[in-house]
Amino acid sequence: FTVIYYVFACRPKWENFACANLLDRMQEVFPYRKAPRFTPERVWELGVSYLKRLLVPWHGKPMFIAGIDTKLSHLQAGHMGAKMSPDEMRALMKDPEYNTFGFNRVIFEIGWAGQGFLSVRLMMKDAIAHHDDETLQMLIGIQERWAEKQQENGMILPHFERYDDYDPAKIAKAALCQGYAPETCNLGWGASEMAKIYALLRDNGIEKPEFLRFSTRICDFFCAHYSPETGFGKLWSMEGEALETTGSVGGFIINGLLDTWRVTRREEYLATAAKALDFYFERDVNHFVCTAGAIDCVAVDKETSFPFVISSLDLFEITKEEKYLVY
């Protein structure tokens, strides 16, 4: 076989970001030649079809389960830090019980990997477009159940199923991704998507003030608890106490602030979002540091770049300040 190596030399456009030059050059060396297989309309149709499969009953009412996986992936994800030998892995992969896709994990999650709120919003758009009031009311019911769980201080468990066995003592023993305590990734997604859901329904003649209140409670909490040293932190207790403050995952709160600002026009949300974005860029992103979007580990993580890219573009659109394009 043949191995080809490429050496790339450049003067970086920005300190610590020579990769930006490299990505531009790669488009010339390795042009993308594949055309889309499906039209956008067909992709949407298939996506909605998949989302409908994720609706499962929970205590007699529909909820969006996080996704379809295999027992093998559940075994890996459920045992953080556990080691599995290659032979053990191969044996399990041959076992249909462990290698068949299905609903092997009961997870009803606000955002992050589960994206329950985003799934609801997309299906709402489809239901409205097709005048499907029955489906729309069912989806509104899902969000009503979530809104009922939120506390006055804005805190909510990121996994709905954890309300069945919630015990504060489990927080110290569980991985952060297991939904026993509020964290800034899911809270940011929650504020953002619920504000969008509120606006979508309002624009179609349906008023759900409790949905907007869901978002403003989260935004009010983080405006009050922003820190110039740790930003929005990572993990919080249901009582509103900071449990873990490391990493860049607090950036997801910026998206929540901006999307809620678009609906409320509360200047505090916009000002706090801009202040926080500057903080995370100066402390983390400008140094090519972007950690803990995965919430359950301190990792260099592409997922955490999402809120900084999106919120920079949003703030440029809102303020027209060129620095956000540089960001």
Model-derived regions, located:
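Carbohydrate-recognition beta-sandwich/jelly-roll modules
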Residues: 1-189, 196-211, 220
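Well-ordered alpha-helical segments within folded domains of soluble proteins
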Residues: 107-128, 178-199, 240-262, 297-317, ...
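Active-site lining segments of carbohydrate-active enzymes
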Residues: 165-181, 192-263, 267, 327
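A short secondary-structure junction motif
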Residues: 54-58, 146-149, 153, 222-233, ...
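Alpha-helical solenoid scaffolds that mediate protein-protein interactions
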Residues: 126, 139-147, 197, 215, ...
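Non-catalytic carbohydrate-binding regions of carbohydrate-active enzymes
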Residues: 224-225, 264, 276-299, 318-319, ...
